[in-house]
From Swiss-Prot:
Ion transport as UniProt keyword: no
Lineage start: Bacteria, Pseudomonadati, Campylobacterota, Epsilonproteobacteria, Campylobacterales
Pathway: Cofactor biosynthesis; molybdopterin biosynthesis
GO BP of this protein: Mo-molybdopterin cofactor biosynthetic process
Gene from which this protein is expressed: moaA
Official protein name in the record: GTP 3',8-cyclase
Family matches, as SMART domains: Elp3
Cofactor note: Binds 2 [4Fe-4S] clusters. Binds 1 [4Fe-4S] cluster coordinated with 3 cysteines and an exchangeable S-adenosyl-L-methionine and 1 [4Fe-4S] cluster coordinated with 3 cysteines and the GTP-derived substrate.
Annotated PROSITE patterns: MOAA_NIFB_PQQE, RADICAL_SAM
Reaction(s) this enzyme catalyzes, per UniProt: GTP + AH2 + S-adenosyl-L-methionine = (8S)-3',8-cyclo-7,8-dihydroguanosine 5'-triphosphate + 5'-deoxyadenosine + L-methionine + A + H(+)
Any one GO molecular function term: S-adenosyl-L-methionine binding
Source organism: Campylobacter jejuni (strain RM1221)
The protein's assembly and partners: Monomer and homodimer.
EC number: 4.1.99.22
Amino acid sequence: MLIDQFGRKINYLRISVTQRCNFRCLYCMPKIPFDYQPKENLLSFEELFLFVKAAMDEGIEKIRITGGEPLLRKDLSIFIKMISDYKSDIDLAITTNGFLLKDFAKDLKNAGLKRLNISLDTLDHKKAKTLAQKDVLDSVLSGIDEALNLDLKVKLNTVALKNLNDDELISLLEFAKSKKAQIRFIEFMENTHAYGKLQGLKRDEIIQILSQKYQIQLIKKDEKAPVSIYKADDYEFGIIDPHSHEFCDSCNRIRLSAEGLLIPCLYFDEALSIKEAVRKGDIKAAVEILQEVLRNKPEKNKWSVVDNETSSRAFYQTGG
């Protein structure tokens, strides 16, 4: 079991397998990323798996594969199969923008993937092009349908933004309901490349908009995550509300970047590298680094909108 210095059980590992993305979403990535790592700096899937296997043995129970856009990493399904073959009951998921999902969903399911989160911020082609900086909506919708047709469990992630998609929240909820998928509205989280450029909606503002048509009722608050589950009449949806609800006291996660940085907190600059250890095959050293990262995990994150504080590390480097 992995326990940090504040008594929190750490059982959730988020792995960014690539910094690259085929979108340039306004809230995440600059038009021309300046800090992509060369391929030789990235851990191979075999090297990543050496650490992941040890982390599961130590107590990791949940793994999420992120990016950048994880489907841009060649042979991702092989990595998924490595993990699911080693521990078939691991809670294993992917977060994707869905653009390439129609082509890869079947391989991912065959490799052992059971669920995924797909970003969907708008149902309007013009807005989608504005947000992603390219024409993406038809491909994303096709990816959603393909995943659902394969009986993969799908959740839709929507970043709620003022003057961009605030007039679509009801239609997005109804779209998700029609697909029998849960939608989660996400409060915009300020980060290095988007600070001051966008304004997000807070939880109460999201509820106020949805209440124009539906009776909204809180039914579940997960203290292990920044998500609250609500009902709009008979449909359940989520709101991820890091602005409105601080969940640091029960944080259960750490992050691993594609180049091997083990990161204790999304909004914390300090990180330790496992690259040298795994490339030497030194699992004991990698586990010692894991334990040190837990000792370094802060009680609270450094995120402060008031003081204009965010981590200097961009979200596409750590998986958000």
